[in-house]
Every structure is written in structure tokens, then in C-alpha cells.
Amino acid sequence: MKNIFGKAILLATALLFSITGTSCSNDDNTTPEKEKTYDMSGFAKGADVSWLTEMEKDGVKFYNQNGKATECMKLLREEGTNSIRLRVWVNPEGGWCGKDDVIAKAWRAQQLGFRLMIDFHYSDTWADPGNQKVPAAWQGYTAEQMKQAVADHTKDVLTALKDRGVTNVKWVQVGNETRDGMLWNSDEAVTGQVSKNAANFAAYINAGYDAVKEVYPKAKVIVHVDKGQDLGGLTWLYDKLKDNGGKWDVIGLSLYPEDDNWQSYAESCLSNIQTLS
């Protein structure tokens, strides 16, 4: 297992300078204010802003500490964020988190210098440990067709991003919180649920992995699970994936501590990161 990721949530873009009318007359002794620069390298300090465009449509505004209305991504950059994560749904209601919406947000992020993580859910809505629903358009597929659908969807979205000029894609998640796999199906010959068909899960992961490398060869591919504090569950999942020829570059761990356990959860997660590496 080559790398580790503890729920890093990422963003990316190339800095955009805007020059407005500045006086250059001899009697103007004012010194133009320098554009602030931001270090967007190093340890990934990220945020998932997948809901941003929908929130903006609903009139939501964001304010800095001085009470000044500020565009959300600019505000995040000012506060030290250097990476953005954007989730992708296959055919979502209203188009939110669909391909076009993701491209729009990714382009905005790149213009601000953020690094990007693209998070494929392979579903029309949320994919999480209790819900890995097959997209409506993929219902009834065979395992081979499902594998091809994963590859095609992944390549389609990433190619569209690249064609738009988005170059700062540093990480790609193939699946979201896949503690027991993804693309669950009542047909055990097709399901990607690990507890029922680990070989299919590995095949679907590999289809996504290979598609990522076709478009962004240098991007790190993440297999993402929750319960970062649970070493037994983590080793079970990644061992199943490894035993079935699964490929990944980075282990992505989510952690959801509560008030009464945050310290032990954090310590366990850090220990698990070292163990899994």
C-alpha cells in the first residue's frame, strides 16, 4: 500500500490576477497594493465544496472574519486551504454534482491555484457505507458491462475536465466510503459488494484506476473507506482488494469522531495509517 490519505479533501487552480484601473500619473504618490500570494503546495489542507453551486443558486453568501461578503473558494484560500474535493454523480437530480457542474467548479478552483481531488461515487446520489446504489442507467448490466460503465464514466468526466483546461487534478477517488465495496446488486454475479463478490469489487476498482491513468497519468488513485479508527475493518477490505488484484495508489480514510471519543479515534486512526503503510 503505497500511500496514505486521512480524509484529505482537496482543491486546485492556477492563480488569476485581475488588474483594475490604477493611476500612473506623476502626482499620484500612492503605492499600488501588492497582490497577496498563497502557498498552494505541501501538506493538503482541503475542503469539499461540492454543494457550492447549488448553494449559490439558493442565494447563500459567505463572509470573512470582518463581515465582508467573499466568494467561498477565495475565502477558503485566504484561510489557508490549498486543495478542493469535488464529488461526481452519474445522473443526479437537477444536475448538481453531475459532469457539467463538476467542470464549472473545478475550473473556478483551478483559477485560484487549488489542487483538485475528483471523487467518483458511481451512483446517481450519495454513496456511503450503507448505500452503494447502482446508477439507474446501469441497472440490469452484467459484470462486464458494469466494469465498462465504470471505465467509460470515469474517462468521460476526466476527459471533459482536461479538455476544459483543468490540469491540477492530483487525486482521484474511485468510489466513496467503500467499506463493503460499491455498485451493490441483488445479483451476486454482478454486485461489487465485497462481502459477496470481492473479485467484482477489485475489477470495478481497476476499471476506474486504468481510466484515471489514461487521462491523468500522474494523478494518485484513492480507494476510500470510512471508520479510519477500525484497523480490523480496514485490513479486511484492503486485503480482499489486494488478494483479487486490486490497484490503488493511496489509501483514503474518513474519521467521524464524537465529543466523547475524538482523542482515542484520532490516535487509532494515526496508528492505523502507519500500520497500513
Locate predicted features.
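Bacterial Sec-dependent N-terminal signal peptides
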Residues: L15-Y38
